[in-house]
Amino acid sequence: VVAHTGNPGQVNYTASKAAISGMVKSLALELSTRNITVNSVAPGFIQSNMTDKLNDDQKNTILDRIPMKKLGDSTDIAKAVGFLCSENANYITGQTLHVNGGLALI
């Protein structure tokens, strides 16, 4: 998400995520002649050991920023990756699929 929205105090982290987006586009162009697609998934806040450590105020602050008002879970990401790896996505390349409950919209 931060590659597309920015995040104060995390320039290095944001830059590393933006670099992945550029790499995906370049690889997609390079490998398209071989009928190879290249895409990425940009997860939002996912229920994990990291989010379990947040206090209620921190969780509520995060949930207030997410239009769907919930954290995702690992199966949400797995389904997105599965789709991009399937024949159903054979004409999709160079894209970043945002799986974040609408967080990147705001």
Task: Kindly give the residue locations of the regions a language model identified.
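Short, flexible catalytic-loop segment of classical short-chain dehydrogenase/reductase
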Residues: 4, 21, 38-53
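Short C-terminal tail/terminal secondary-structure segment
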Residues: 5, 82, 93-106
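Catalytic tyrosine of NAD(P)H-dependent dehydrogenase/reductases that use a Tyr as the general acid/base
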Residues: 13, 21, 91
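A glycine/serine/threonine-rich, flexible loop-to-helix segment
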Residues: 33, 45-66
